[in-house]
């Protein structure tokens, strides 16, 4: 939300933690997403509630020439906007959004946050994904995000819950996301 507010770019979340921009807003092939930021968090729990939260955020702000193998999957805010970006504004708005959502969770309204995550993560419904199990690669169609944050994936008549591993979005040669 901080990137959306500070830049006007309609970024999305690609489950679980990538901030991406649909190619309709850039010069890529239709249906691709370019990563502009990533979020990692850890919330150790004792009992029902987290005792602390550690959050790491990386935002690609400056224009960058990416290696050929990344150029269709990575981008930056300045590249997308074709103008300089006020880094302080991106930081302030991102921290303000984190503060707002921390308050929502603190007040016991986790479902509100989960619903917003789902709204900002359209690829979590109806997208092809491939992931590895111990036995083999599996493929399915995303079927939403569970109340505990797991990605539901429909495989025929079964629904799998993904909580960790490596996911390829789209065709098997698509974007890989480490969980």
Task: Cite the ranges covered by each PLM segment.
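Catalytic beta-strand/loop module used to bind and position nucleotide/cofactor moieties
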Residues: 1-179
């Amino acid at each position: 939300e901080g990137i959306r507010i500070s830049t006007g770019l309609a970024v999305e979340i690609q489950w679980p933690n990538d901030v991406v921009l649909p190619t309709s807003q850039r010069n890529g092939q239709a249906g691709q997403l370019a990563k502009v930021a990533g979020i990692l968090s850890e919330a150790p729990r004792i009992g029902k509630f987290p005792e602390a939260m550690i959050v790491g955020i990386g935002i690609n702000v400056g224009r960058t020439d990416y290696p050929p193998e990344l150029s269709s999957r990575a981008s930056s805010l300045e590249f997308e906007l074709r103008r300089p970006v006020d880094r302080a504004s991106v930081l302030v708005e991102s921290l303000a959004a984190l503060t707002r959502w921390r308050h929502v969770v603190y007040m016991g309204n986790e479902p509100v946050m989960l619903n917003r995550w789902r709204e900002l993560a359209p690829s979590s419904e109806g997208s092809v994904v491939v992931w590895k199990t111990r036995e083999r690669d599996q493929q399915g169609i995303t079927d939403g995000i569970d109340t505990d944050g797991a990605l539901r994936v429909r495989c025929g008549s079964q629904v799998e819950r993904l909580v960790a591993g490596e996911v390829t979005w789209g065709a098997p040669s698509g974007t890989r996301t480490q969980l």
